[in-house]
Design a protein with these regions (language model features):
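Short gly/pro/ser/thr-enriched loop/turn and capping motifs at secondary-structure boundaries
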Residues: 33, 108-113, 149-150, 172-176, ...
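Glycine-rich, anion-gripping cofactor-binding loops and their flanking helix/strand elements
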Residues: 80-166
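Hydrophobic/aromatic beta-strand patches that form the interior of the parallel beta-sheet core
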Residues: 24-26, 103, 142, 166-168, ...
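Structural signature of the thiamine diphosphate
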Residues: 1-43, 67, 132-164, 199, ...
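Cofactor-pocket helix-loop regions in the catalytic cores of large enzyme subunits
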Residues: 3-4, 27-117, 210-238
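Phosphate/pyrophosphate-binding active-site segments
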Residues: 162-238
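Conserved acidic residues
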Residues: 72, 139, 182
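Short beta-strand elements at the ligand-binding edges of bilobed clamshell
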Residues: 51-55, 115-127, 178-191
């Protein structure tokens, strides 16, 4: 029925903008393409096969809490999913709550204020040394809304060799696709981080984690003057 096309197009936009945003293919049979509209109906179509999980499983969230309690060197990796979910505040709250510095993927830049003490900058092949070094030394990675692309990980067989990985993502197909994870949590970044902060509200970071974040902040201070150095202006040479 050609008359259903208006509803299909509207529904495709709803799907494209929900869950993990992305393109939607509309496959239109030839007889529909050649048909004529008798009416205009823009009501949404029921799509029972598409139902993104927004709220993370509370049992998985509690397991994440337990892994965090055991960690001495936690870090947070933030991707574009944090920005799309408007979860920057929840991300920052978790970072300070558990003494875990934050680094971002290229698409995750802006998930945390780059001038924040907890921000280590971007990781990966175009990232900062302090960020990449901390990946290798950490014992727990909390990855939020990130795909673990090769631009961020480099060689997979040498990525985060000492870390357990918690992966939070609204798209279950992304979890475990590139990097093996110890704890998957499917859900909207804002909702899951809010739940995690809630179960950790009485958490007191251990001394090892406090020393860890202090060490990384000091490393960042040592590296940054090299890119902000302005004591002696550069002079062009012939």
């Amino acid at each position: 029925d050609p008359n259903i096309m208006t509803s299909i197009v509207k529904t495709s936009f709803e799907i494209a903008e929900s869950g993990r945003p992305g393109p939607v293919l509309i496959d239109v049979p030839k007889e529909i393409q050649e048909g004529e509209l008798d009416s205009f109906d823009d009501s949404l179509i029921s799509t029972p096969g598409y139902n993104p999980t927004l709220k993370g499983n509370i049992k998985q969230v509690r397991k994440a809490r337990d892994l965090i309690r055991e960690s001495k060197k936690p870090i947070i990796l933030a991707g574009a999913g944090v920005i799309l979910a408007n979860a920057s505040q929840e991300l920052k709250e978790l970072s300070y709550l558990i003494n875990a510095p934050v680094m971002t993927s290229l698409l995750g830049k802006g998930a945390i204020d780059e001038t924040d003490d907890m921000a280590l900058g971007m990781l990966g092949m175009h990232g900062r040394k302090v960020a990449n070094d901390s990946i290798n030394e950490s014992d727990l990675i909390i990855a939020v809304g990130i795909r673990f692309s090769d631009r961020a990980t480099g060689r997979l067989d040498s990525f985060a060799p000492n870390s357990k990985i918690i992966h939070i993502d609204i798209d279950p197909a992304e979890i475990g696709k590139n990097v093996d994870v110890d704890l998957p949590i499917v859900g909207d970044a804002k909702n899951v981080l809010s739940s995690l902060n809630n179960v950790l509200k009485d958490y007191e970071s251990n001394e090892d984690a406090k020393k860890w974040v202090k060490l990384l902040i000091e490393r960042k201070k040592e590296c940054f003057p090299r890119v902000t150095y302005d004591d002696i202006p550069l002079k062009p040479k012939s």
